[in-house]
Every structure is written in C-alpha cells, then in structure tokens.
C-alpha cells in the first residue's frame, strides 16, 4: 500500500467517544509491550506517529488513526500487564470487548504475539472470541529480529501448535528490519477487499 497521508484522529474509552463510522477499520490487539505501536508505525512508514514506550501499559485508550483519508487503524490498549492498577486493568477488558462488539466498520483484527513467548490463555480466548463473532483476524509474531532464523522457525512451529493452526497462518514481523510488513499489508488488503 502506498501511504500518502496519516493522521491521529482521537482517543476514546467508550462508543460515544469513537470516531464517526465512516471508514473501514483494522484493529490491533495484543499484550502490553508486544509492539503494537511499533508495528503500526512500521506499517505506515512513520517513526513516531503512534507513541511507543519500553514501559508496558503505555497505551491505555483506544487510539484512532486515519490512513489515506479512507482507512482507520485502531490501536487497542494492551492486556496482561500486572503493574497497571487493578481499576484500570478491570476497565480495559470491557472497553476492548465493547469496541469489538459494537464497531460496525471493523473489518479485521491483527493479534500480535511476541515470537519469543508461548501463547497464553488470553490469546487463545481472543482467537476463540474472534471466531465466534465471525471477525476476520491475522496473527502477527512480533520481535522476530530478537531471534536467530533457526530459533524463529522453532518458535513459529511451537506457537502454531499451541494455537492449533498451520504455520503459514502466522506472520513473522520485525519493526526493526521490516520483516513481514509487505505480507501483512497483502493480508489486510485481502480482508478489506474480499
């Protein structure tokens, strides 16, 4: 995809604060510090439009970005970070589920999993939830540059087995080397233009 224009639109916590549902949307979900913001910056060829942090739990709101005036990218809060207050953690689950449930322009979800880690219960629950609600999704394995090629293949195989799916359904990704960027755009294009 040729990126001509990208802009941050707004942050939200509830449906009344969401952007008007005028454009197709792709949402990005995953654990805290899995690299959602870095992945979005890599996809849109920007270094810092989406705020990144080495501290988990930085994204605490649903952030909407408009790409080329016709596609909305949505950065969801990360889940699973214990050092965020219990009150905030308790709000994230319902906030994300509400967005995923009511957003009629949502066309695809990109679920990010750190390639160095085994999938956790939350990832399996999300995949089951996406499937039950007939929401198309892709799984991206982030931080591939942190592993050797041999270790990447070993981990891809283990993660695919843990998720009960074929390896070719997983996209290895690195924001540092841009590995997987073109493939992810191809997959998104297929989902957005069936």
Swiss-Prot record:
Matches recorded under Gene3D superfamilies: P-loop containing nucleotide triphosphate hydrolases (3.40.50.300)
InterPro entries: G_ENGB_dom, GTP-bd, GTP-bd_ribosome_bio_YsxC, P-loop_NTPase, Small_GTP-bd
Residues the record lists as binding GTP: 30-37, 57-61, 75-78, 142-145, 173-175
The keyword Transport appears for this protein: no
Highest rank taxon of the organism: Bacteria
Cofactor: Mg(2+)
GO molecular function, one term: GTP binding
One Gene Ontology cellular component: cytosol
Biological process according to GO: division septum assembly
Keywords (A to Z) from UniProt: Cell cycle, Cell division, GTP-binding, Magnesium, Metal-binding, Nucleotide-binding, Septation
Residues binding Mg(2+): 37, 59
Domain EngB-type G: 22-194
Recorded family membership: Belongs to the TRAFAC class TrmE-Era-EngA-EngB-Septin-like GTPase superfamily. EngB GTPase family.
Protein task: Necessary for normal cell division and for the maintenance of normal septation.
Identification of the protein by name: Probable GTP-binding protein EngB
């Amino acid at each position: 995809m040729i990126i001509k224009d990208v802009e941050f639109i707004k942050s939200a916590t509830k449906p009344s604060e969401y952007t008007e549902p005028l454009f197709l949307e792709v949402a990005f979900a995953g654990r805290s510090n899995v690299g959602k913001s870095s992945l979005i910056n890599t996809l849109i060829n920007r270094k810092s439009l989406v705020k990144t942090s080495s501290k988990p739990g930085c994204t605490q709101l649903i952030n909407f970005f408009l790409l080329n005036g016709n596609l909305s990218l949505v950065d969801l809060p990360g889940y699973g970070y214990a050092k965020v207050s219990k009150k905030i953690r308790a709000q994230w689950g319902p906030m994300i589920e509400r967005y995923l449930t009511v957003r009629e322009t949502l066309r695809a979800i990109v679920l990010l999993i750190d390639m160095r880690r085994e999938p956790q219960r939350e990832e399996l629950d999300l995949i089951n939830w996406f499937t039950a609600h007939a929401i198309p999704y892709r799984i991206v394995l982030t931080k591939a540059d942190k592993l050797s090629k041999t270790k990447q293949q070993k981990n891809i195989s283990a993660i695919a087995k843990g998720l009960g799916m074929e390896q070719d359904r997983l996209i290895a990704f690195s924001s540092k080397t841009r590995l997987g960027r073109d493939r992810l755009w191809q997959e998104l294009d297929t989902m957005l233009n069936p």
